[in-house]
Amino acid sequence: MDINGNAFVVGSGSGIGRACALGLAKGGAKGILIADINLEAANRVATECRGATKYMIEIFERIDYCINCAGIGVQLARNISEADFGEFSRFLQIHVEGTFLLVRSVSAAMQLQELRPIDPTNPGRGGARGSIVTLGSGNSFAAAPHLVQYTAAKHAVLGVTKNAALDNAAHGIRVNCVCPTWVETPMIQSARDGGVEIDSWVKGMVPLGRIATAEEVADTVIFFCSPRSSYATGCGFLLDGGTTLTCHV
């Protein structure tokens, strides 16, 4: 998919991040830096983001694609009347603050990079300095019962993405958000362990009748990294197996 630059993947130890790193490698990425930043260490996140970005530039000289897959899943679903404030704050810290700090750091680095033609044979496509992809969720668009911490965090991730896309557009940097619903990852298993009845919900609500694979999400992420999506920025791309095609009453 015309992937020949350098990729910076955060949260690639397992699940979607791992699938993205492997997909980029198979797709021909010149270099890949895998980083697992500790987003729960609030006093160190900004420093770790800057340090990882600086290291990426030192090793590969530029960042062509940045993908943030770091996140946590809900382990205890609760009604809003019983929701735990500490857990709510933790979700905002990891998903929202982590996304903001990483996107801020990478945007600053990309803005200093050389503008390269997207397609030398088609000048009308213009030039690019890089592409950033964040990971939202179906909950970036809609709420789900007893998941206020996750819904709030994923709405905010999409908001950060849209504003970053707007601020970066003049610099030739695209920023998009891939928003899957249920994906077969360790995070989903963690939600199962916490009592969320994912499998029965999927059978009744998803037209395609199954949970997505991590590789299917990675394919979408890589599309938004590639020049084939050169006119797409600020998108929240819903990858839901048709879940939102109908109204479930």
From Swiss-Prot:
GO molecular function: oxidoreductase activity
Keyword Transferase applies: no
Recorded superkingdom: Eukaryota
Pathway per the UniProt entry: Secondary metabolite biosynthesis
Annotated EC: 1.1.1.-
Chain's role: Short-chain dehydrogenase; part of the gene cluster that mediates the biosynthesis of virensols and trichoxide, fungal natural products that contain or are derived from a salicylaldehyde core. The pathway begins with the synthesis of the reduced chain in virensol C by the highly reducing polyketide synthase virA via condensation of one acetate and 8 malonate units. VirA has interesting programming rules since the first 2 ketides are fully reduced, the 3 following ketides undergo beta-dehydration, and the last 3 ketides are only reduced to beta-hydroxys to yield the trihydroxy portion.
Protein's UniProt name: Short-chain dehydrogenase virB
